[in-house]
Amino acid sequence: MLQPRYGIWVPVYGNCGAMNHPAEPRDASYQRAKRLIQLAEDCGFTTTLIAQHLINPRNQELDQLETWTTAAALAEASDRIEIIAAIKPLLFHPVVLAKMALNIDAISQGRFSINLVSAWFKPEIEKSGINFLPHDERYQYSEEWIRLVKALWRGERVNVTGKYFQVQDLQLTPGSIAQPHPLVYLGGESDPARALAAQEADVFFLNGRPIDVIRQTIREVRQIPRAPHPHPLRFAMSAFVVARSTDAEAQEEFQALSQLAGHDDRSELMKGVDSEVVMFKNLAKYPAVGSNGGTAAGLVGSYDTVARRIAEFVDAGVDTFMLQFQPFTTEMQRFSAEVMPRVQALTLVA
């Protein structure tokens, strides 16, 4: 069994769990993000995800880091970790974005990737005066967008007359250090999201879900016809970890976090969600601490329990775990010291 890769969500909107945790700031800051990434490298994490929002979706009065300038700065401030920047195609013309990505690819010496997100938080789009396309059309837009971006990354001289974009005789240099181009991650729970991932993505991002749901999802996505591609589609999963010496201690901490998170005002977030987004339709089915599934993945328990569950996900086809913690620093260090070695032992035996 292959060893999994571990990553962290950069807390670009403050924190990843309860908004009012006494040990963590509510507002985001670049200096904190930089410290966490550098510590993550030292702890053995090999990738990181920087979500993209113009305004803080949890509370629009709180600070929100800008994704792409943060990605460029973190690329310079780090040595080994993969930098994944989320991108909502509605916010950037593909030519401009392709050029920006190539520059961060150069800064990072080939450690840069993108996470394609077709947008779900309406206020940041509509307040900017941008047309918030219907759900399925956003994926059509994203498909044309990413195909144009990838052609430019490959160094092609591009002539495109599409539904959304017209580009004439354009080639970008210098080309990509990452070959054939920076990796494309893509997540979503709708049929259009799955179809686009099968056609254009290198890695499909899964929201944290119970193991049986993840197994079924991977089986279904693997059945979707894939465009000609040098590699099969890989799978990554988000999760929020609560690990302690015993299952009882972990459950006690989880209940404390759940109680804190229960006091969060989510009305602003939910009012801004596109009602057609499947992920949010599933929230009631999979209640959790953390975003994008969080603790619904079941990584709550003793160090041995969490390690066994990670090994089960690896066996199901997940090779990358994008993790959230709270408090972030201490829990990330705990995971590195206690859980990573146990997973390694289990996967080596398997």
Segments predicted by a language model, with ranges:
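Hydrophobic faces of well-ordered beta-strands that scaffold small-molecule active sites
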Residues: 4-8, 48-50, 82-85, 112-116, ...
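Glycine-enriched alpha-helix->loop->beta-strand junction motifs that scaffold or abut catalytic
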Residues: 77-80, 108, 199-205, 317
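Conserved, mostly hydrophobic/aromatic
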Residues: 40, 44, 74, 104, ...
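An alpha-helical appendage that flanks or caps ligand/catalytic pockets
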Residues: 2-4, 8-12, 42, 128, ...
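Active-site mouth loops of central-metabolism enzymes
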Residues: 16-31, 86-95, 178-189, 241-244, ...
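Active-site-proximal alpha-helical scaffold in enzymes
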Residues: 95-109, 113
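N-terminal beta1-alpha1-beta2 module of alpha/beta enzyme domains
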Residues: 1-77, 161, 179-182, 281
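Alpha-helix-loop-beta-strand connector modules within alpha/beta enzyme cores
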Residues: 61-84, 141-145, 333-350
